[in-house]
Amino acid sequence: MGARASVLTGGKLDQWEAIYLRPGGKKKYRLKHLVWASRELERFACNPGLMDTANGCAQLINQLEPALKTGSEGLRSLXNTLAVLYCVHSNIPVHNTQEALDKIKEKQEQHKSEPKKPEAGTAAAADSSISRNYPLVQNAQGQMVHQPLTPRTLNAWVKVIEEKAFNPEIIPMFMALSEGATPSDLNSMLNTVGGHQAAMQMLKEVINEEAAEWDRTHPAPVGPLPPGQMRDPRGSDIAGTTSTLAEQVAWMTSNPPIPVGDIYRRWIVLGLNRIVRMYSPVSILEIKQGPKEPFRDYVDRFYKTLRAEQATQDVKNWMTETLLVQNANPDCKQILKALGPGATLEEMMTACQGVGGPAHKARVLAEAMAQAQTATSVFVQRGNFKGIRKTIKCFNCGKEGHLARNCKAPRRRGCWKCGQEGHQMKDCKNEGXQANFRKGLVSLQRETRKLPPDNNKERAHSPATRELWVSGGEEHTGKGDAGEPGEDRDLSVPTLNFPQITLWQRPVXAVKIGKEIREALLDTGADDTVIEEIQLEGKWKPKMIGGIGGFIKVRQYDNITIDIQGRKAVGTVLVGPTPVNIIGRNFLTQIGCTLNFPISPIETVPVKLKPGMDGPRVKQWPLTAEKIEALREICTEMEKEGKISRIGPENPYNTPIFAIKKKDSTKWRKLVDFRELNKRTQEFWEVQLGIPHPAGLKQKKSVTVXDVGDAYFSCPLDKDFRKYTAFTIPSINNETPGIRYQYNVLPQGWKGSPAIFQSSMTKILEPFRKKHPEIIIYQYMDDLYVGSDLEIAQHRETVEELRGHLLKWGFTTPDKKHQKEPPFLWMGYELHPDKWTVQPIKLPEKEVWTVNDIQKLVGKLNWASQIYPGIKVKQLCKLIRGTKALTEVVTFTQEAELELAENREILKEPLHGVYYDPGKELIAEIQKQGQGQWTYQIYQEPYKNLKTGKYAKXRSAHTNDIKELAAVVQKVATESIVIWGKTPKFKLPVQKEVWETWWTEHWQATWIPEWEFVNTPPLVKLWYQLETEPISGAETYYVDGAANKETKLGKAGFVTDRGRQKVVSIENTTNQKAELQAILLALQESGQEANIVTDSQYAMGIIHSQPDKSESDLVGQIIEELIKKERVYLSWVPAHKGIGGNEQVDXLVSSGIRXVLFLDGIEKAQEEHERYHSNWKAMASDFNLPPIVAKEIVASCDKCQLKGEAMHGQINCSPGVWQLDCTHLEGKIILVAVHVASGYLEAEVIPAETGQETAYFILKLAGRWPVKVIHTDNGPNFISATVKAACWWAGIKQEFGIPYNPQSQGAVESMNKELKKIIGQIRDQAEHLKTAVQMAVFIHNFKRKGGIGGXTAGERIIDIIATDIQTTKLQTQILKVQNFXVYYRDSRDPIWKGPAKLLWKGEGAVVIQDNGDIKVVPRRKAKIIRDYGKQMAGDGCVASGQDENQDME
C-alpha cells in the first residue's frame, strides 16, 4: 500500500517534468501527480505497481477506458496522467496531455487495423501460466485429473499451525495453501492437525451447521434421477464424508461447475474465524495506541486484530478509515487528522515517524503542524509573499517580546553577536555568523523572495515556506529540535565528560559534510539528515520526503562522511530545499548523541469518572476584588509554567475556587473546592497505607532529609480527565466573561493526587534503590529521609546523585528544605543522631474554647502521646460529643480542666525516643490509668522508649478491665507488626490466675501473644466470681419481668423455693429492663449466698461476661450488689415450659401486663432440633414460634452451647464465586466448597489431598452449579497442573488467597468450623464420617435459616442464580430495544416523523421518546427499524425491509 514516489528515475523523471498539463498552460507535471495517481488507483482497486512499466500503463488505460464516458472529472484526470506516463515509459515525445492522448489513439487504431496473428501455442501458454500446485490438472489427453496435495504443502500447513497456533495469520495462509483443493484434500489438511482438538471440535460443529443449512436451502430432488445425470451434492458430500474423490472432481469440472471445494473452504474459513476470535479475544475497538508506542507498532497490532474480525470487507474498510485514526494517541491523531481523510497508510506512517517517543516531543510536533497548516492556508490565500512580519527578539535569553536591555534573565556571558568571551556586542569586530539564529532567517527570507511566482502555491505546502511562516518565534522553530529555549533548559549532568551543547539557543554546530563545512541544527526529532544545496561526490537518486503538511523533493547521497565535533559517522545525506540544515538521528545515534530533557515525561495514570456520572457543574460564587486580582496573578504564573491551560466555552464543567492568605504572610494562596469532583471520581487504592514512624528507623551514621518541591505539579494529569478540573476566575460586576482554565498536572485537593503521586514517585525511585542497596530511602508524599552507614562525604555524593536522578524526572529538591545537619525536621518529628522526639508542642492558653479549638487540642495531644506517656484525652473528647457547630463555645467540666492541667505538666519536660536495633528483643509494657484509659511503652532497653501510646476505646456498653486489656494488647501488637514487622513480648498488670479464670470461659474474645505478669498498680482483677454449680443450702430465687409495649408499664418480681415472693411495678420500661430489675430485686432481698434462676437470655449474657463497669445504671447497681455477695449462682431456664418456680413468677408479673400465649408447635420444634439441630431462625419460621422461644430451645441444647461467633469482613460475593478448602477431621480429609453469596455448602470426604481428587471434585461442582471463579489457598493440590487444566476446560477462573492470612479465605474457613460443629451434633447418628458429612451438608443447606432474606442457603443460591439470569436477560433486552429507531405518524398529520427512541414494544402499541417527550403510538402507525448509526447507513439502506421481531428477539 501507499503512494509510489519512485515510478520514474533519472532522465525519465526530467522528461516527465517537462510535459505541460494543458496546451498553452504554465503548469507542468510533478512527482506529486504520480503520488496522487497511485493513491487513486488503490481507491479503484487497481494495482499501482503496474505504473512502473509501459505495458502496465496500457493495461490500466484499457481497464479505465470503458468508464470514462460516465466517470467523474477525477477519473478522467487519472486516465490522462496514465496516458502521459505511458508515453514517457515508451519514449514517445509529447509536450502536453492532449498530445499524449492523440498518440495513444493513433496506436490503438493501428492495432485494430493489423491482421490477427494465429494463436498457436496459446493453450500451452495458458497451461504454463496455471500453477502446477493445483490439485486438479489437465493431462495430455485434455482430461482433468486429481493430483494429491504434496507432502511439502501439508508440512507447510502443519508448521503454520504449530508456530501461529490460531492467530489471524492462519486464515490467509490456509486460503493460499488450499487454492483449488477438493474436499478430500481439505480433509487431509485438517486431519494433519494433531493437537488443538478443542479447536477442531469447534470447526466440526461449524461445518455441520453449514452442511445442514446447505441441505435446507438445496432440497434433494424427488424421484429417481434420469440415466447419465449426475446427482446434486448434499451438505455431507461437500464436506467429503459421503462423496468419493471422483464425484468431487466431476462436480468441480462439470458444465456448469459446482465448486464443492470452494464451498467447503468457505465453511472451514467460517469455522477458523470463530476459532481465531476465541484464541484472539481482543476486539478491534480495544486496539488503542499507547502514549509512548510508535505508530508503526500500533498499526501492526491494528491490522493483526483486524484480520481476526468477522466482518465484511466494507465494514473492515470503514474500520480502517475511522478507527485507525480515532484510537491513535492524541499526538499522532492530530497529525493524522491534518493529513486529511484520503491519506494512505504510507503517508500516515511517514508523517507519524518518530512521534511515538517522549510525549513532550510528540506534543510539540503536533502543535507545530496545526499552527503551520492553518498559517500556510491563510498565507497563500492572502498572497503575502512580500515579506514576513519581523518580531523583536532578545539576544540574551532568546525569547520574543522584549529587547536585551529589558531582559530580566541573568546576563549571558560573552558577546551576544559572535558568542566569544572577552568583549561585548557593541565592541564586536567579528563580522562572521551571529551567535543566534536570526541572521540565518534573514538570509532565508531574501532567498525566498526570489522564488518564481508560478511555484508559489506548490512551495506553500513545502516545509521551507511553512518553517518561514512559523519562524517568527522559537516557540515553533525550536520545539521540534533538541530542546526549547528558556531558563529551565540550562541543565547539565556534571558527571559526564562528553561534549555538551547548551540549549539556551537552538543547538546549531559547525559540521564537516564531505569536504565542506556547514552550520547545521542537531535535531533529535528528525529521522533523516537534510542539507540545503551542497556539492557532494558520488551518484544520487531522487526521493520524496514527508514534512509536516507536505512533501519535498531531494537528492539522496549514500555513504557520506560527517564530522561533528571530532566524531565521525557515515550515512545517507539528503540534499534539497530545507529552511535549515538538519543533522538527524541517522547520524546522531552513531556518535552517541542523546537528548537529556530536564523534565522527562512521567507516564500518565488513566483516570475515569464513576460509571454513569458526569463532571462537576458547580457555579463559581462571588469573590472580592482583592481575591480576584490575587487569583489572576497566581493563574497567570501557573499558565506560564504549563501547570494550567486556558480553555473556551466548549467545556461545560466547572469547580468553584477561592483564595486565602498564607500563614504569617501577605501572599495569597489559591484553593479549589474539589468536593463535587471527588464524589464523581473513581476510587483509588492508596499505595501507602500509613505514615512511617521514627521508632522504626535504624540508627545510621549519615542522614539527609529533603523535600520534593511542587510535588503534585510535577506529575501530569491524564489528558482525557483534564476537562473535568475546569474552573473560572470571575470579574467584578460581571464586567467581562470569566477566565476559564483547566489543570494539566495533579491538582491540590483532588482525591486522586496522593495515590498517583506516590505511585509515580515509587517507580522513579526504584532503579536508584536497586543501584544503591546500601542507602535507605523513606518516602512519604514529598518528604524524603535518606540514611546510610557511609562516610559523610560519600553519603552526600550519593544524595546529590539522587537529586540529579529526581531532577531528570522533573522533581526538584529545593536547597531551602535540604537538611544536611541534625536535628532533622521530618514528618512532624525531630531526628537527632541517637534519639528522636516530636517537634515542640505548645498547648494554647485560651479564655474561650470552641469545638474547633478542642478538636485541634486533642489532635496535638494524640500526636504527643507517641513519646509522652500518660497523656489522656477522654474528658476533653466528652466536651465535643454529638453534632455541634465548629464555632460553638464549649464550657469545660471540672474533670476536663484537671485532665488538661495534667497534660500540660507532662509536656513541660521534653522526652526523647531512641532508634530500633534489630538485634535486640522488643518489649511492650502496659499500665492502667483508670476511667477506661490505658498507656503503654515499647522499648528494647529499660528507660529508653522506642515509642509510647495510649488507648481509650470502649468497645461495648458493659465491659471489664480484662476485656479492655485484651484490646490494648491487640492494638500494640498490630502497631508493632506495622513498624518493626514483629510482635513484642508483653508485660501486663494482671495475675496469671485471674487471667486464666477469665480466659477459660472467654477464650474466643481475641488473640493474645506471649506475656508475663508485672506488679504495676493498679492491678487488673475480677471483682466478683459467679459459681458454676448451684449452692446447696442457699435460697433459690425464680425471677421474671414483663412490660407492655404500648403503655411502657411493667412489673418485676421473684418467687423463692421457701415461699417468699415480691413484685414491684415499674414505669417507662422495657421487657429487658424489667428482667434486669427482677435480678436486682433478688440480689437486694437475698443474703450473702443465693441461687438465681432467670428465663432471660439477655440478662444472662450480660452478667455472665462479668463486667465491672457499665453505661447502664441498672447494670451498675447489679455489679455493686454482686461485689457485696460471697457466692452467687446464676442459671437460665426456658420460659413457658411448665417449670415450677418459673411458671409461678411468670403468672405474678404477667397479670395485667401481657396475655399468656398458647404456643403450639413447641414439641415438634424440639423434636426437629434434637434430630437436625436446626438454628433458631429455621424453627421460628417453620413452626411459627416467637424468636425468643426458638432461641431458648437452641440454648437449652447442650450440643449447641458453643462459645463465640466469627466476625465477618468483606469478600467477593458475585453469583459465580466459590471458595474451596481442605479441612481435617478424625484423621480424614474433607474438601469443602462454599458459594460465597449464599453460604450454600458442598463437601466430600476425599481419599487423598491430591490435584487429581481436587480436579474431579471441581468438575462435579461445575456440573451442578454455574461456577465462574474459585478462590483457594496456595495448597499443593490447588496449585497443581491437574486443577489448572480442569479449571481451563470448565472455563473457571482460579484465584488464590494471601499466604498465612486466613481472612482471605473467610467464607470457607468459617464454613469449616460450622460443618465440624454440625457433624459434632449429629455424629452419633451415623456410623461412617462420609455419611455424617453429607447429613451435615443437608442440615446446613436446608435446615438452617438466617442471613440475607432469612432463608436457607439452598433457597438463597437458587434465588441468586435465577435473579442473575433474569437481570442479564433484562439488560440484553433493554440493549436490543435501544438499537431500534421509530418513525411514526400522528392521527391527523400524514407526514412521517422521527427517528424517535424505542422504549418499549407491545402487541398493540409502542412507547417512544421523541425530543424528550414520551409518547404512546398505535402499532399500525409506527415503523420500527434498526439504527445502524451514521457511518454505516448508505443510500441503499432500506429501512422498511427489516423483520423487526426477528432482530429484537
Swiss-Prot record:
Residues 824-832 are annotated as: RT 'primer grip'. GO terms for biological process: DNA integration; DNA recombination; establishment of integrated proviral latency; proteolysis; symbiont entry into host cell; symbiont-mediated activation of host apoptosis; symbiont-mediated suppression of host gene expression; viral genome integration into host DNA. Binds 2 magnesium ions for reverse transcriptase polymerase activity. Binds 2 magnesium ions for ribonuclease H (RNase H) activity. Substrate-binding is a precondition for magnesium binding. The active site is at D523 (for protease activity). Residues 105-119, 446-461, 473-491 have a biased composition (Basic and acidic residues). Mg(2+) 2 binds at D1040, E1075, D1095, D1146. Zn(2+) binds at H1169, H1173, C1197, C1200. Mg(2+) 1 binds at D707, D782, D783. Its EC number is 3.4.23.16, 2.7.7.49, 2.7.7.7, 3.1.26.13. Residues 12-19 are annotated as: Interaction with host AP3D1. This is Gag-Pol polyprotein. The lineage of its organism: Viruses, Riboviria, Pararnavirae, Artverviricota, Revtraviricetes. The gene is gag-pol.
